[in-house]
Structure formats: C-alpha cells, structure tokens
Amino acid sequence: MSQQPANIMKYKINLFGITRDIVGDNVTEIEMSQSADVQTVLSELKTNYPKLKEIKSLLVAVNSEYAESNLVLSENDEIALIPPVSGG
C-alpha cells in the first residue's frame, strides 16, 4: 500500500449548481504541497477550472459553515463551493 508524502495535503471539494456543471462532477480533489487556506484552495480551483472565475459571488463552506478566506484548512475538512442562488 503506497502512501503520499507527509507534506502533500489533499482537499476534497463538494460542488453544487453551476460549479458542478463547470467541473463536470459532484466532487473534485486538489493536492497542495502544504496546508492551505480557503483563498489558496479557491485560487487553485479557478486555475484548474477557469470558468469558475466568472462566478462573482462564490461562497465556500467548511464543515457546514460559511468560511472566511483566511481560514486554514485541514485534510479532513468538508469543503463545499456554493454558487449564487437563482430562480424564483
């Protein structure tokens, strides 16, 4: 059984609405070389999926609570991208 190096952090992000449509799946994972905050993970996602940059009011929830951009994440955190709600 192989293990990843200790300094690699793997984050699982749950996707909803338009973010799910852009990525093409309900969940995506990214790996970072060190622990990261919400803003860093969001920036990496926007690099990997440039259409996410078009969403102006994208919110991030960590462990079922809206998160500030400077919140440092743990690998076991439940991360969700929440797009703006539309409709009537």
Please place each PLM-identified region on the residue numbering.
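Ubiquitin-like/PB1-type beta-grasp interaction modules and other compact soluble beta-rich domains
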Residues: S2-S86
